Swiss-Prot record:
The organism of origin for this protein: Actinobacillus pleuropneumoniae serotype 5b (strain L20)
Record bears the keyword Transport: no
Protein's recorded name: Small ribosomal subunit protein uS2
PROSITE patterns: RIBOSOMAL_S2_2
Keyword match Nucleus: no
Lineage, opening ranks: Bacteria, Pseudomonadati, Pseudomonadota, Gammaproteobacteria, Pasteurellales
Protein keywords: Ribonucleoprotein, Ribosomal protein
InterPro entries from the UniProt entry: Ribosomal_uS2, Ribosomal_uS2_bac/mit/plastid, Ribosomal_uS2_CS, Ribosomal_uS2_flav_dom_sf
Pfam families: Ribosomal_S2 (PF00318)
A GO term for molecular function: structural constituent of ribosome
Length: 238
């Protein structure tokens, strides 16, 4: 069972919040105190919440659920992509485009265009058009890949989103709320937990903390996928 320990979180700096003057009072239940003008997150609250979230990610994944990892901060971007790829799920790590979930029909058309351009790079189309046109299409392809590359194979809305930084990704959370999609999110002391179904109080800036969240989430998803494969094999054997 995918789980994290108190020691893991301490070593990663999960307990370091933001400066006290930037706090959000709604995070008061999860704050232990302050040190040198910086809030300290109560890891005794975070630990059970995090492990509960991991168990639910495993359950969703075991039912073939799709998880969308969201983290567009510079500190999270590459790690978000790596974690999603590692557990064969989906990601948005560059910029959240308004309507990515709530206007899925339009997004689907952009994904189709992205895939069409990818095909053109392989089937010789670019050799038959002018250099200028080829350059324009290459730039369009790069732009679409940056925005939609992580969801181009998602084939429909996700069953949950896992967010690094509730404050930074508030638009994604609001869209998920509007559609009834469960939200798992790292919520720092300057953020609101509103709209987050599975709150994980913790530092959302430190690279080591971000890596811990993503490694644990990816492990939970892989565990769920593994149990699903085992169940299918048993059913086939019977």
């Amino acid at each position: 069972m995918a789980q994290v320990s108190m020691r893991d979180m301490l070593n990663a700096g999960v307990h370091y919040g933001h400066q006290t003057r930037y706090w959000n009072p709604k995070m008061k239940p999860f704050i232990f105190g302050a040190r040198n003008g910086v809030h300290v997150i109560n890891l005794e609250k975070t630990l059970p919440l995090f492990n509960e979230a991991l168990a639910e990610l495993t359950r969703i994944s075991s039912n073939n659920g799709k998880i969308l990892f969201v983290g567009t901060k510079r500190a999270a971007s590459e790690a978000v992509k790596a974690a999603a790829v590692d557990c064969q799920q989906f990601y948005v790590n560059h910029r959240w485009l308004g309507g990515m979930l709530t206007n899925w029909k339009t997004v689907r058309q952009s994904i189709k265009r992205l895939k069409d351009l990818e095909t053109q790079t392989q089937d010789g189309t670019f050799d038959k058009i002018t250099k200028k046109e080829a350059l324009m299409r290459t730039r369009e392809l790069e732009t679409l890949e940056l925005s939609l590359g992580g969801i181009k194979d998602m084939a429909g809305l996700p069953d949950a989103i896992f967010v690094i930084g509730a404050d930074h990704e508030h638009i994604a959370i609001k869209e998920a709320n509007n559609l009834g999609i469960p939200v798992f999110a790292i919520v720092d002391t300057n953020s609101t937990p509103d709209g987050v179904n599975y709150i994980i109080p913790g530092n959302d800036d430190a690279t080591r903390a971000i890596q811990l969240y993503l490694d644990a989430a990816a492990a939970a998803v892989k565990e769920g996928r593994g149990s699903n494969v085992e169940a299918e094999l048993e059913a086939t054997a019977e």
